[in-house]
UniProtKB/Swiss-Prot annotation:
Belongs to the gamma-glutamyl phosphate reductase family. It catalyses: L-glutamate 5-semialdehyde + phosphate + NADP(+) = L-glutamyl 5-phosphate + NADPH + H(+). PANTHER family: DELTA-1-PYRROLINE-5-CARBOXYLATE SYNTHASE (PTHR11063:SF8), GLUTAMATE SEMIALDEHYDE DEHYDROGENASE (PTHR11063). This is Gamma-glutamyl phosphate reductase. Its main location: cytoplasm. Catalyzes the NADPH-dependent reduction of L-glutamate 5-phosphate into L-glutamate 5-semialdehyde and phosphate. The product spontaneously undergoes cyclization to form 1-pyrroline-5-carboxylate. PROSITE patterns: PROA. Pathway: Amino-acid biosynthesis; L-proline biosynthesis; L-glutamate 5-semialdehyde from L-glutamate: step 2/2. The keyword Amino-acid biosynthesis applies. GO terms for biological process: L-proline biosynthetic process.
Length: 434
């Protein structure tokens, strides 16, 4: 297919999605929830087909020499699929984010202003692997009244085709037009999708640093996403050793390919001699490769030396860098210099240290005495997430339903005109909030 043909075809797909989304935006909460329930049921019915498609994807990816972290994201086992379907049902239980009155203000008798939440329109979601991400995104899009055009990586094509086939079958039994969900599978379509600013309202890329930056640099459509997942745990001088070990191990090994897994462990010098041998043993038992700065090597001489590049590397694997710092201030400075503004944690029993850490670490998530792996839309109670945003502007952190809506101003009058409120005898506004 030529570039011109791809553009023409995708233009038609985008128009269909937008038309379907405009109808979805007008549906009742009950109708949307029925559609979400039908999607969950259809996914359950197609479970074997989806899992077999994923096995085929994994076999093909292995033959092509896929990187280990990406392979872990690609794998969709029965447990992951079950959790994803449960997440769909959880989204159905969430409050409808559409039609919420944010402002209701009388400007004058009979002249009322409202600010009401409404869908964004059409979402373009581009992701490299993680087929279960498609399931999460589709459920959130339906609940928030948005159409969605999915572009999966070549390694996950079979899995995503099976998922979208099931979703469309489920939607065909409801009031939601199946055209509200579309799937693209080629690189050429990715480039054309990024040019569809007439039809697509938001692009959400999920993938590697280089991938997200490519998207950001090649579209005029607003982009929501993060380019790195360099997270830290700082072990303060007042840390409880057992808590520190448990959190450090969980934050690294529970799922090292996740963007909220830690890549660097910062340790206060006064606790390092006691803490480091214990945590090193616990991590070694989980096959984690350790790298340390010069001071760490004095305590753990058997580990590899860390270099400057390690502080800015997202390993997404069983590798962890360790640095000893002299103070909380130094730890915060390191995080703000090398971190990705994703999620960072402090382990301490000192309340003042927590307040300082929370106030000065410029990340979307700042945690105390708990694992960075909690930075997740499902664990936050959002039902699911479309992605993580590390931007300074909202939405920030795990983005659920509230990040997929915008608002419009509605004003109702009885023939009111602006001239009444201007000039020498201007009538004053009442500006009374309901």
């Amino acid at each position: 297919m030529t570039t011109l043909q791809v553009a023409s075809s995708l233009n038609d797909i985008a128009q269909q999605t937008r038309q379907a989304a405009s109808l979805l935006a007008m549906l009742s909460t009950e109708a949307k929830n029925q559609a979400i329930a039908a999607v969950a049921q259809a996914l359950e019915s197609a479970k074997e087909e989806i899992l077999q498609a994923n096995i085929a994807d994994c076999e093909a990816a292995t033959a092509e020499g896929i990187a280990k972290p990406l392979y872990k994201r690609l794998q969709l086992d029965e447990h992951k699929l079950r959790d994803a379907i449960a997440g769909v049902r959880d989204v159905g239980k969430l409050a409808d984010p559409i039609g919420q009155v944010q402002i209701q203000r009388e400007l004058d008798t009979g002249l009322v202003l409202k600010r009401i939440t409404c869908p964004l329109g059409v979402l373009g979601i581009i992701f490299e692997a993680r087929p279960e991400a498609a399931i999460q995104i589709i459920s959130l899009a339906i609940k928030s009244g948005n159409g969605v055009i999915l572009k999966c990586g070549k390694e996950a094509v079979r899995s995503c085709e099976a998922i979208v086939k099931a979703v469309k079958q489920g939607l065909s039994t409801t009031d939601v037009n199946p055209d509200v969900v579309q799937l693209l599978t080629t690189r050429e379509e990715t480039l054309e999708l990024l040019r569809l600013d007439k039809y697509v309202d938001l692009i959400i890329p999920r993938g590697s640093n280089s991938f997200v930056r490519f998207v950001q640099e090649n579209t005029r459509i607003p982009v929501l996403g993060h380019a790195d997942g360099i997270c830290h745990v700082y072990i303060d001088k007042s840390a409880d050793i057992e808590k520190a070990i448990a959190v450090s191990v969980d934050a690294k090994v529970q799922y090292p390919a996740a963007c909220n897994a830690i890549e660097t462990l910062l340790v206060h010098h006064s606790i390092a001699a006691e803490f480091l041998p214990k945590v090193a043993q616990a991590l070694a038992e989980r096959q984690v490769e350790l790298k340390g700065d010069e001071r760490t090597l004095q305590i753990l001489p058997e580990i590899a030396a860390a270099t400057a590049i390690d502080w800015e590397t997202e390993y997404s694997d069983f590798i962890l860098s360790i640095k000893i710092v002299d103070s909380l201030t130094e730890a915060i400075a390191h995080i703000n210099q090398y971190g990705s503004r994703h999620t960072d944690a402090i382990i301490t029993e000192d309340v003042a240290a927590v307040e300082t850490f929370f106030g000065l670490v410029n990340s979307a998530g700042v945690f105390h005495n708990c694992s960075t792996r909690f930075a997740d839309g499902f664990r936050y109670g959002f039902g699911a997430e479309v992605g993580i945003s590390t931007q300074q502007m909202p939405p920030r952190g795990p983005v659920g339903l509230e990040g997929l809506v915008t608002y419009k101003y509605q004003m109702t009058g009885t023939g009111h005109i602006v001239a009444t409120y201007t000039g020498e005898n201007a009538k004053p506004f009442t500006h009374q909030d309901f």
